[in-house]
Amino acid sequence: MDLTDALTLFKRLGVNVPSLSAKEFSLAYYRLAKRYHPDHGNNAGHNLMANINAARATILKAFRRRN
C-alpha cells in the first residue's frame, strides 16, 4: 500500500492524518481497531482490519522518515 492509499483509507474512516502528531495518530488507530476488529463482532471483518493495519504501517514509516 502506498502512502496516498493509506491516507485515503484513514480519511474515509474519519481520521485526517496530516493534522495529527504520531501519538495522536496512534490513538486514532486504536479507536479504529476497537471499532472495526472482527473479534468485536464487526461485520466488516478481516479484510477491513487488514487494510487498516497495512495503512497504519505505511503511515508510521512516513512519520519515522519525517522525524
Task: Write out the residue ranges for each language-model feature.
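Short, well-ordered alpha-helical segments
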Residues: 46
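N-terminal J-domain/J-like co-chaperone modules of DnaJ/Hsp40 proteins
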Residues: 1-43, 51-66
